[in-house]
Amino acid sequence: MEPDRQTDIAALDSTLTTVERVLDVEGLRTRIEKLEHEASDPKLWDDQVRAQRVTSELSHAQGELRRIEELRRRLDDLPVLYELAAEERAAAAASGMEAFAEADAELKALRVDIEATEVRTLLSGEYDEREALITIRSGAGGVDAADWAEMLMRMYIRWAEQHKYGVEVLDTSYAEEAGVKSATFAVHAPFAYGTLASEQGTHRLVRISPFDNQSRRQTSFAEVEVLPVVEITDHIDIPEGDVRVDVYRSSGPGGQSVNTTDSAVRLTHVPTGLVVTCQNEKSQLQNKVSAMRVLQAKLLERKRLEERAELDALKGRGGSSWGNQIRSYVLHPYQMVKDLRNEYEVGNPTAVLDGDIDGFLEAGIRWRNRRDIS
């Protein structure tokens, strides 16, 4: 095998060994055995919340172990692929060069997969393994901003669907002409919050407005908020008297009523002024339950931001307002999507807006990790 390829394989082996150590593969196997024992208990489903937690954690742990074992198998097979290619080339077989090309392609693909798994080891924050709640709000830019907010919503949902993650739309407030004023949805997947947390902030779009008769260039803004789903262990207790409940009829695009009953729910947390709405469920009770989940998540985030502000003050640095512009999507006069915090950029905004955002998410995870340890 050529020295360069040997060096590349050795580097990948070192990275994968580090990943295996950080993820504690043997500990993961022990954890799976324990969870499998719990899952086999006939009385487990007497407690629905515990049962869902156990089965979800078991599925995630099994998936992590399969992923690591598959990467190790592929890496161990790689030298064999190069040896076979060398033998074919030595025998002057026409397939020799083709075999080398296939081995090089596997080396490249394996590097991408190992680096992506390495990024997962950075998700060690207190809430990183949680599912995520995403709220998108249109900002400055009128109808273009509302359309931009809906484009962002589609981008994240497409990303989740491509990864076979569950998505639950909790609330959508449609704008009069096009797009949405705001939308809230949940991404049901382990580590969804840690993966998406760095998406929080203001996203800027520059394009020729499809709503302008003179086809002028328009700059639009939308804000993205990412929260971890609250669990019972977070102890976010909200006294009943602290919440005002208002009900109203669900509405669709253009303000058109889509329900003949007052099923939509608006919760106002009186002490803080936080407001949450939910209208996508079929019943008022379901909407109230979903809205309470979002309110609990917002209160948890408020508590975390207060704690972070105190830490920032101790470290002598400014706070981290989530309203800061983080990414620019330019469709005209050139095409580019660029993250303003870590300089990661791509020249294909169409693919990005269709959900191809893994590169930005990985760069964001690395950026957040550097920020948090600084």
From Swiss-Prot:
InterPro entries xref list: PCRF, Pep_chain_release_fac_I, Pep_chain_release_fac_I_sf, PrfB
Which Pfam families does the record match to this protein?
Answer: PCRF, RF-1
GO cellular component labels: cytoplasm
Q: Which domain of life is it from?
A: Bacteria
The record's function comment reads: Peptide chain release factor 2 directs the termination of translation in response to the peptide chain termination codons UGA and UAA.
Q: Where this protein primarily resides, as one coarse class?
A: cytoplasm
* Protein name, as recorded: Peptide chain release factor 2
Q: HAMAP family from the entry?
A: Rel_fac_2
Q: What are this entry's molecular-function GO terms?
A: translation release factor activity, codon specific
Family stated for the protein in its record: Belongs to the prokaryotic/mitochondrial release factor family.
What's the source species for this entry? Mycobacterium leprae (strain TN)
Keyword list, A-Z: Cytoplasm, Methylation, Protein biosynthesis
Q: Which PANTHER family match?
A: CLASS I PEPTIDE CHAIN RELEASE FACTOR (PTHR43116:SF3), PEPTIDE CHAIN RELEASE FACTOR 2 (PTHR43116)
Which parts of the sequence carry N5-methylglutamine?
256
**How would you describe the post-translational modification of this protein?**
Methylated by PrmC. Methylation increases the termination efficiency of RF2.
As recorded in Swiss-Prot or TrEMBL, the protein's gene is named: prfB
Recorded hits in NCBIfam families, A to Z, give:
prfB (TIGR00020)
Q: Which Gene3D superfamilies match?
A: 3.30.160.20, 3.30.70.1660, Release factor
Location in the cell reads:
Cytoplasm
Please name the PROSITE patterns in this protein's record. Answer: RF_PROK_I (PS00745)
